[in-house]
Amino acid sequence: MALSNTLSLSSSKSLVQSHLLHNPLPQPRFSLFPTTQHGRRHPISAVHAAEPSKTAVKQGKWSLDSWKTKKALQLPEYPDEKELESVLKTLEMNPPLVFAGEARSLEEKLGEAALGKAFLLQGGDCAESFKEFNANNIRDTFRILLQMSVVLMFGGQVPVIKVGRMAGQFAKPRSDPLEEINGVKLPSYKGDNINGDTFDEKSRIPDPHRLIRAYMQSAATLNLLRAFATGGYAAMQRVTEWNLDFVENCEQGDRYQELAHRVDEALGFMAAAGLTVDHPIMSTTDFWTSHECLLLPYEQALTREDSTSGLFYDCSAHMVWVGERTRQLDGAHVEFLRGVANPLGIKVSQKMDPNELIKLIDILNPANKPGRITVIVRMGAENMRVKLSHLVRAVRGAGQIVTWVCDPMHGNTIKAPCGLKTRAFDSILAEVRAFFDVHEQEGSHPGGIHLEMTGQNVTECIGGSRTVTYDDLGSRYHTHCDPRLNASQSLELSFIVAERLRRRRMSTQRL
């Protein structure tokens, strides 16, 4: 397919370059073994991560269980401690779910995002469940993340780092330890790896054997994701065809048609240059997993010492984050996380004091290593415009390197007239726009977006071009916790973000 103008040719070339950068040929995708490097090491930078250096510990000696000396919030109370210990010993003997080299590779990519040279797309279920576990659901979420990543990559002309809230995102913090229905109070549902969502006394008792089931489900999910990422399902041509189909069947498809067809033209150029669908660059992709580091006994049981660096990695996921409710400076969760070498996320709301954020980053990343810390901001559009700039200035003033990411979901949860929790697409979009506006104002880099979403055609968030109304919520409301964007809403959001990335890129090029 011939390209008709210089802009298309330039975009095509940039897409090739960014795809090559994101998928270097010599390194196998989703390697089952730690990544090894040969020759002279690169110095630490946001682009090239050096050989991992041991984390400096300022608050006493760290150990795998030093978190037990701190106050631990949001942890369940198991009725039989001996049974819990038996389960944890079994997990300690099981193979790791991910490897240190994979986590280091992700950290290097996130370091690029901190400098505006890459963009993080992190998404998946609010909470994975045993009941909804099947290959089709995993495939559909992976597919929509692929579609979104291609759109974002073309808009920003930078690599897109794909990280799923998958293969371990079970446990959920709760604001109230008890749930009341019709005058009956029971312990709150905390996620399928802790207790059951059925409202009866037996289901709500924490069961340690659920940890084994969660581990097995995570392993199966990872196995399928690896197959999808390397087996041809992620082929660029296939993903582009899916996006073109979305545009043709979308009520507001005209808004996105130009970008979708430019991507298609770029693929024509790449094919003419020899990058056909059979080329590994065009048929495989990198993909990482993440979840909230909440259930510390489980995380400790899956932490392993890396033989190549001597560092400890939480091998339950490539990336883990500390939540808004568990990020206390002197708390157990921060104590555990400061000693593992994975890239870490920090969830931040409007309640975060700038000085507290600086202290927290210093505890978790005293060496100021690029890619180590991702600050995931969740506060609603109005608070974003008022509060985020203070956080950005404080972190920059302290000389700290972080990747700024927008979570437009958690600050926009409302209750519908029918009683179900929902989120409005327009509110989500408003927070994303506020995030970009603040970074444009501050001269900092918007490093990514973090979404609760699914590849299913659910009706949990209202709005979007294929409008979901309050009346529609009950028809396909399947979430076990918070409302998620459906496939159409997720892809629509990615087109809007891609256009914002394109505008940012064009304005930067003119400077």
Swiss-Prot record:
Inducers of expression: By glyphosate, wounding and fungal elicitor.
Localization terms from the record: Plastid, Chloroplast
NCBIfam families to which the protein is assigned, alphabetical: DAHP_synth_II
Similarity comment: family membership: Belongs to the class-II DAHP synthase family.
One term of GO molecular function: 3-deoxy-7-phosphoheptulonate synthase activity
Gene Ontology annotations of biological process type: amino acid biosynthetic process; aromatic amino acid family biosynthetic process; chorismate biosynthetic process
SUPFAM superfamilies assigned to the protein according to its UniProt record, in alphabetical order: Aldolase
Upper lineage: Eukaryota, Viridiplantae, Streptophyta, Embryophyta, Tracheophyta
Pathway(s): Metabolic intermediate biosynthesis; chorismate biosynthesis; chorismate from D-erythrose 4-phosphate and phosphoenolpyruvate: step 1/7
Signal peptide, first to last residue: none
GO cellular component: chloroplast
Enzyme Commission number(s): 2.5.1.54
Listed name of the protein: Phospho-2-dehydro-3-deoxyheptonate aldolase 2, chloroplastic
Broad class of where this protein is predominantly found: plastid
Catalytic activity: D-erythrose 4-phosphate + phosphoenolpyruvate + H2O = 7-phospho-2-dehydro-3-deoxy-D-arabino-heptonate + phosphate
Tissue expression per record: Leaves, stems, tuber and roots.
Keywords: Amino-acid biosynthesis, Aromatic amino acid biosynthesis, Chloroplast, Plastid, Transferase, Transit peptide
Keyword Magnesium: no
Pfam families: DAHP_synth_2
Protein's UniProt keywords contain Amino-acid biosynthesis: yes
